[in-house]
Regions:
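Active-site-adjacent structural segments surrounding the nucleophilic cysteine of cysteine proteases
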Residues: 1-82
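Non-catalytic ligand/cofactor/substrate-binding and regulatory segments of enzyme domains
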Residues: 1-17, 185-223
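Short, solvent-exposed linear motifs at loop/edge-of-secondary-structure regions
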Residues: 36-61, 143, 147-150, 243-259
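Extended, compositionally biased low-complexity polar/Lys-Gly-rich tracts
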Residues: 42-55, 87-103, 216, 249-251, ...
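Conserved active-site-adjacent core of cysteine acyl-enzyme catalytic domains
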Residues: 54-55, 59-141, 163
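Short helix-loop boundary/capping segments
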Residues: 105-140, 144-153, 161, 172, ...
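Active-site signature of cysteine proteases
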Residues: 137-210
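Extracellular glycoprotein-like low-complexity segments
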Residues: 218-386
């Protein structure tokens, strides 16, 4: 990815990200630098979220082709190798990390598919713009751009632009009777092979473009709420540079393990997980919000699945970070491994403390960032850091 100091200033404001500003530009706070590195790592899984947002911005005239390429008359004339185009896509891809975007996901997580369709229809009628996300049973997701909804008396047809199939109009069909949606992705002619899939409640959601307004509160700052209206929260972010791997978080709460890479997992109250949206049904990471008023203590381990088989992996390199209210940002780089009951990558206690311990058979590199302070420490196999 191409997220840098300039991007971060536009996303969160100079005061939140720049430790100082020199003749050469913004010198990032350590936490901002760590966050940007992790976000760029996650983009190896694709940039569909950024393309879906940019498509909506161009469609609604919130962005102009002339800002991307003065010579371009249509979006088809834009080059994927143009740095301005790449930077814009990466910039808007990053907004899925915003707490307001995550909170929109949380709200729509409780909607039935027909309720999502109705909300979208009403929003479009009132001039609101959205991106739409769909999720697979394998724990990954894809972002597309909706622009119309039609109800034929039996089903809703949501017309979308899918950046995987440029130049065509695709449709998501929602059946209110069964509360199921289906998407024959790529079907441009009847009977043609497709990459279609389907789902029910909690597998389709909307993000209002208003939730992506910039600048916003940074998730890595020392502010009291880090941009959340939910109050006392911890943000967990897990990413991987391995394009063949899907990574998430295994949370242990009151002795029970919840695997966020398994869409069938029913998460407890106070836990909200969203896969990062990449290319197709892919993406290299997950974002998890923990409401610490409901879940005061927990343990977190990185978990990885092979993208082609969905089998768990015990050798996948990953990066996981935790941002909690009023405490330093902690980032660990290690690899997945077998769990042991007395060891967790992150062990967050009721007092706001975090203990870091790599999985058995692995080492870890730990970074702690707080304001101007930045501390790095290697943790050997069998060791811990707090």
């Amino acid at each position: 990815g191409t997220v840098d100091a300039t991007s971060l200033v536009a996303l969160f404001g100079e005061e939140a990200v720049c430790a100082e500003t020199t003749a050469e530009g913004c010198v990032l706070f350590p936490a901002a630098e760590q966050w940007a590195a992790q976000v760029n790592e996650a983009m190896v899984g694709g940039r569909c979220e950024g393309m879906a947002v940019m498509a909506q911005r161009l469609f609604s005239n919130s962005a102009s082709l002339i800002d991307l390429d003065p010579a371009a008359k249509t979006t088809f004339a834009l080059s994927k190798d143009d740095s301005d185009v790449v930077d814009a896509i990466d910039f808007w891809w990053t907004t899925q990390m915003f707490v307001p975007v995550q909170e929109a996901y949380i709200a729509f997580h409780e909607y039935q598919p027909s309720e999502v369709a109705k909300e979208l229809a009403a929003g479009i009628a009132s001039g609101k713009d959205y991106t739409l996300a769909i999720y697979s049973d394998e724990g990954s997701g894809h972002s597309i751009t909706p622009f119309a909804v039609v109800f034929n008396g039996k089903t809703y047809a949501i017309s979308v632009y899918d950046n995987n199939y440029p130049g065509t109009v695709q449709q998501i069909v929602v059946d209110p009777e069964t509360e199921r949606w289906s998407y024959a992705a790529g079907a441009t002619t009847p009977g043609a092979p497709t990459d279609g899939w389907s789902g029910g409640k909690s597998t389709i959601d909307l993000t209002p473009m208003a939730a992506r307004a910039v600048p916003t509160s940074a998730p890595f700052t020392d502010s009291a709420t880090k941009g959340s209206t939910r109050g006392n929260i911890s943000n967990l972010l897990v990413t991987s540079a391995d394009a063949d791997t899907i990574v998430g978080v295994a949370l242990t709460i009151d002795g029970k393990i919840y695997d966020t890479t398994d869409r069938k997992t029913v998460l407890p109250d106070g836990i909200y997980s969203r896969p990062l949206l990449g290319a197709g049904l892919s993406g290299n990471g997950s974002s998890v919000i923990v409401d610490r008023d409901r879940v005061p203590a927990f343990e977190a381990d990185g978990v990885a699945r092979a993208r082609d088989t969905n089998e768990t992996r015990d050798d996948a390199a990953y990066t996981m970070s935790i941002d909690s209210d009023g405490t330093p940002r902690v980032t660990v780089r290690t690899s997945t491994g077998p769990r042991e009951d007395d060891r967790s990558t992150f062990r967050a206690d009721t007092e706001g403390g975090v203990e870091v311990a790599p999985p058995p058979g692995h080492e870890a590199d730990v970074n702690m960032a707080n304001g101007y302070n930045n501390f790095n420490a290697p943790v050997p196999d069998g060791g811990s850091f707090n």
